[in-house]
Amino acid sequence: LIKEKGLGERGMYKIVDESGFVYTQYIYLKEADFEKMIVAHAEQIFGAAGIYFDIKKLIGTPKKGATIPDGYFLDLTFHNDPRLYLVEVELNSHDVYGHIGEQILRFGISTETDKYKIKNSLLAEVDKDSGKQQKLADYFSKSKYNNINELLDKVIFDNRPAAIIAIDEATDALYHVMSQLTMTTEVIEAQTYVCGDKKLHRFSPFKDEVITDLAPDIDADELDTIIVPAREDGF
């Protein structure tokens, strides 16, 4: 555990609970450990309305933009406007320009050249997961799509997939890189705080501005306007 290293542009937060215990930010040294936390809490971070696929398979053409996404998120927030996201899990210590920016560029190229492989990978995961099957069945009962093939054709072939970067600190440099990309890209900032053997996870939920304070009897599809709160200090 490193407590006071790599403060970045904004410095590290500390969290105090009701009992007065102080939690200090845990600095992940390995991307694999950070990714384990993201996957373990995928439903809370990405949203219970969608499905996270922990799939790591090469897509695209070797030497022509091939890449391996860290995962996929099928966003089912809107019953008639689903969307597929390729997920890139990163540490802020990595090169924002040479590594993260290049990965998103490769995502964009590969989603154009390897659509069928992406679809088949997702289908295979659904076929062996009853939980995903049930969530999709509930979705189909309220949407215009009748089955998983129709849904995946929509989000992969008809619409262009987007990207999500899950990172431990979202800096201005990251947002600058994103502004230069043609692929629609969202950022989720996630961090872990520790106090002895206790842990807390702090994150910016995906599409939180859409579903926060939404009454149970109101469908997200019925919203006419979505107001996104301004980002303060990159969060």
Model-derived segments and their meaning:
Residues 1-235:
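Charged, terminal alpha-helix-loop-beta segments
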